[in-house]
Amino acid sequence: MLDLTRLLPGPAAALRLAELGADVLKIEAPGAGDPTRTMMQSSSDRVAGRPGAFYRMVNRGKRETRLDLKSEAGRNVLRALAAEADVLIESFRPGVMERLGLGYATLSAANPRLVYCAISGYGASGPFADHAGHDLNYIGYAGVLDQLASRDGAPIVPNFQIADLLGGALSAVTQILAALWHVARGGAGRFVDVSMTHTSYAHNFVAQVSLLNEGAAPAAGSGLLNGGVPCYNLYRTSDERWLAVGALELKFWETLCMALDRPEWATRHWSLGQAIGGPDALALIRELAEVIATRTLGEWVESLESLDCCVSPVLTPAEAAQHPLFNPHAYAAVAASAADSDDDGA
């Protein structure tokens, strides 16, 4: 597999395929190479002259080489590599590879089984095909960012790149695997066109259901899954931490109400007619918030985590990294491997 991508979406897609067993060759331009080499780079990495953790994390498990695709010699090398490859993935702006003489039509003529994946912000064709953008722009156009708003209506800047990772990386992985299966069954290769904006839009199911049913997506704090019911909400604890209550189904809500010694709350549930975002729902949110505010996060976790009621702590990334759920020893080994990899590949 040839990985010509940079930044996050393409490298993450290639990483996931490498984890599944693909032999990935990362190809970078001479000089600075992939911008993530220095993006969020620590001072110790700069002093040591090695790429930052971001680069090492999303490019681990790959071989690496440099090619100048602006030179005929570099393009000839890539053509030779593509003639033997199963997959090529790139994230240039649409049209760049064609202008270099390295587009799908050219490369597939020499290798009809080639699966060629192009990840872009707005797709290989259409009115925005040549527009620049990043994750925030893509989820903005897709109607996703609007749904990540606080109660005052102000959208947040999420530190989880939804379009890059869901719209770009995971969509690329699934489509590449489907294309490879087609080839394995005797079919020809495929051009896989991944638009991060369109794939993000396609996954915005809940908002689109409300749009169909009611003519508008729910404002923050007014829908079933965005804070409009007490059984599916976030609550502040006495130590200024947060508890996630996901007791969406009645049986989980009933268990939670009994654990809180509030059995009378069990009938105040959306499935029993409580209006979502209505007066009773908002009142019960306030009542439950008062109860949760009486104890620390640790105390709530100790008393509720073992119960079958879908309640969990809101952990920081540092806490999550040490949680038994994620097998910290295995993750530490991965991190150590990334830290030990040098500039010549992982």
Predicted regions located by residue number:
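Short Pro/Gly-enriched beta-strand edge/turn motifs at strand-loop
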Residues: R37-S42, N213-A220
